[in-house]
Amino acid sequence: MKTIILALALIALVSSTQSDVIDTIKKIDQSPFGRTLFDTIWLELQTGDPLDRLVSTLTDLEDRYVAEQKEDDAKNQEYQGACTVDITAFDKDLAESNRKKIELEARLEGQLYPQRSILEGLVAQKKAEVKGYQKDLDELDAQRAEEHEDFEEKVLEHQEATAIIAEARRLFADNIEHESFVQKGKAAKQPHKFTKDVANLIQKHFTTSAKKTAKFQHRKGYSKLFKAFATIASKVEQLADAGAVQKIIDLADELLAKISDSLSLLRFAEDKRVESYKKSRNFVVIALNVAGSALANAISDLAALNDIIAQVEASLDTTVQRIENVSADRHDRFTQCEEAVQDYSDARSARQSDRDVVSQTIGLVNKELRTLREQLALRQQAGEQI
């Protein structure tokens, strides 16, 4: 009983093994390379020649696959090593460029741009100061010009009044001394009378002067004074004697002296104003020059800083462009290396597949030649033409 079971088991094992061999043959036959090998083997079987030479050829082919794979492995290892070196160099370059980019950006944002803002503010401040001092200087000069014009007008008014009073005094003095205006044949103590013509002349002089001085901008009181003198002149014929007229002359002298004193005070005040103006103007000019010098220095510093900023920005642009270029080169190189890896893997798989086919075929020829012959014959009977 045990013998029967063992025999059945052996039969089942043989049947299973033969089935596996047939599956292997069919699998090999499905590949173009395997079909070519089987076609070659079938031709050899048809000639009846020993298959030793074919087995030797297949063995050499298998060995060549192994050698080629080793050579390919070495080339791939060398190529991937070069890829690693290149990628590492790109990464190092990118790291250095990014570090430089960060430094440049930090210098711009943390140092140069704030400095520029400060200098721009300083320039604006100094421009405002220069403008303010220049305005003060212009206003000071304008005020001085206005004061001088006012002074000249006052001097002219004083001079006009002096001329008017001096002329009136002359008329009084000349006519009181001229015998043609004094009635003769009377004692010296008798009153001296002015003629009507003299009175009219003096009255006209003061009336005209009153109208003229009414246009004065500063000493408008002269007009009233000269109107009063005109009234006095209209009554000059009624003056009792030359002593009364002399009082008028003395009054004129007193007025002339007061006008002279007033003019002296006016000139003194003008001198003080000029002195004060010169001092004030000197202070403003000094402040203007200091502010102008500070402005020039600030503008120069700003221009120099802008040059530095332009250089740093240009360096930053160059660095950013380098990062883009190196990144693109790294991507291209990485892609090449990955494609090479894929090509190597595909070639290795294809070579391994062909090697497996050769190895399996050698095994079939050496161990399962009968089954292989039967399957090739069946394939031939099925219509497969070699």
Curated annotation (Swiss-Prot):
Domain of life: Eukaryota
Propeptide part(s) removed at maturation, as residue ranges: 20-48, 184-238
A Gene Ontology cellular-component term: trichocyst
Coiled coil: 51-154, 294-325
Disulfide bonds: none
Entry keyword annotation includes Isomerase: no
Keywords: Coiled coil, Signal
Subcellular location: Trichocyst
Signal peptide: 1-19
Main localization, broad class: other
Protein known as: Trichocyst matrix protein T2-B
Organism: Paramecium tetraurelia
